[in-house]
Amino acid sequence: MASLPNGAASASASAAGGGPAVVDKEVDFANYFCTYSYLYHQKEMLCDRVRMDAYHSAVFRNAHHFRGKVVLDVGTGSGILAIWSAQAGARKVYAVEATNMAEHARELARANDVADIVEVIQGSMEDVVLPEKVDVIISEWMGYFLLRESMFDSVICARDRWLKPDGVMYPSHARMWLAPIRSDLAENKMEDLEIAMHDWNLFVEDTESYYGVNMNVLTKAYRAEHEKYYLKSAIWNNLHPNQVIGQAAVIKEIDCLTATVDEIREVRAQVTMPIKLDMTRLAALAGWFDVHFRGSKQNPATQEVELSTAPDVNGGTHWGQQVFLLTPPLKVNEGDNVKVSFTMVRSKENHRLMDMEFTYELHESSGKQLPAITTKIYLE
């Protein structure tokens, strides 16, 4: 993930109703951008071999898209994509970065002898003014489950303002996936919840015993708070492929050349996922994404490259997968079908976080249909 605007929505926008909330840029910077201004965070992404290999291959196997061209790197971070673009033959690279990481990007450009090509610009992509249109927009904008962080908004803004009509996007396409899985995470999180409640009950007893104040009236609220944290929040995990017990389904496809912010502000899908493993338990759904570097119809890639964050026997990426616990879990068998209705919207409190709702129902191979269950999950 590269860097760009997290933020609390202004009260005036909420009061007005209707359109998208206005973002407080200072709050956004404090909550989101600042994370990417640290080298340790950049190093985490630079050490992700799947990520690095995919972007490196996409650029150098398709050098014709870069040779002699003007490139815009949105959220350049350390500047690695800008440097590769220059090494692939770009005439000019504008590398936009909102944080002070911009200075490190300049240092790296100088150290790698591309400072005459790579111009690092510190500022918000929405505010930056370039002296010319660009042939290529490259960006590593993907967040957890693809759309967390909402950085793609800034890429869309850059595309609409600066990309030439025959320009290309790197990546050019993206997909979101959902799959049924087996996992012990639910038991682990339930145990954590009970430990937290046991600690709370001791606190209530001690507070009344030592200080004469009965806190028990807050027990219900405390439990609800912790149920949200332990059971209703998406869990980062690097799953093994054998934990996937059924057919994964695409729930969203994005064409980066044509997508609008309205199209990604809310995601809705209805999918049916056949179970492929007998006598097991559906404990959760897992979400991940992949992106593709295809160029465009008018200017296709010589070699298409895919970056996938699906469960992998060789280990995963820094994105991992997001696990959405289903409570209660369901006993399933091969031949059963899980039908899921899915909705994901941006949090009203922070447009970079996501609120999700899953309605799932089991259709057994015998013909029996279990009642639908609805659960809310928060991707924070």
From Swiss-Prot:
Annotated keywords: Methyltransferase, S-adenosyl-L-methionine, Transferase
Residue span(s) of domain SAM-dependent MTase PRMT-type: 26-357
Cellular component aspect of the GO annotation: nucleus
Alphabetized SUPFAM superfamilies for the sequence: S-adenosyl-L-methionine-dependent methyltransferases (SSF53335)
Region (Dimerization arm): 187-227
Family: Belongs to the class I-like SAM-binding methyltransferase superfamily. Protein arginine N-methyltransferase family.
Taxonomic source organism: Oryza sativa subsp. japonica (Rice)
An example molecular function term from Gene Ontology annotations: histone methyltransferase activity
UniProt function note: Methylates (mono and asymmetric dimethylation) the guanidino nitrogens of arginyl residues in some proteins.
EC number(s) on file: 2.1.1.319
Swiss-Prot/TrEMBL GO biological process terms: chromatin remodeling; methylation; regulation of DNA-templated transcription; vegetative to reproductive phase transition of meristem
Claim: Ribosomal protein is one of the keywords in the record: no
Pfam families in UniProt: PrmA (PF06325), PRMT_C (PF22528)
Disulfide-bonded cysteines: none
Subunit note: Ring-like homodimer.
CDD domains xref list: AdoMet_MTases (cd02440)
Domain of life: Eukaryota
Binding annotation for S-adenosyl-L-methionine: Q42, R51, G75, E97, E126
Name of the protein in question: Protein arginine N-methyltransferase PRMT10
Active site (catalytic residues): E140, E149
Enzymatic reactions: L-arginyl-[protein] + 2 S-adenosyl-L-methionine = N(omega),N(omega)-dimethyl-L-arginyl-[protein] + 2 S-adenosyl-L-homocysteine + 2 H(+)
